[in-house]
């Protein structure tokens, strides 16, 4: 990597996300049974939907945690908690990436018995998840297709008046 380049870019397509989420679902299939899936918003919503469909799980909730501002980490802020999950026993918590692990650690404080899974994990975040598919280097910046600045992003249509 050149001195001018501070990170490696890893752009992902919708097809790659789907394939990787299905691979994660296969790894999780024998670890259940699951009461439901909790998607960490917003990055975990697409993978959680794919995984829930693959595992035939109908109960899906969200855990809204804010941990990124621009491209730098900051302290986690819990915006919305899932209801009726107790200590998390039997629940599957999904996010797209475990970067530093802070988001998963915050979630684990609320639901210590849940199973935590991500498609991708960086070295600092690997210990925060129970299951993941792919390890990526610390200096890799993953570009998800649902992010507005990505070429595969499709903006919502304007409402018809």
Give, region by region, the residue ranges found by the protein language model:
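PRPP-associated nucleotide enzymes
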Residues: 1-161
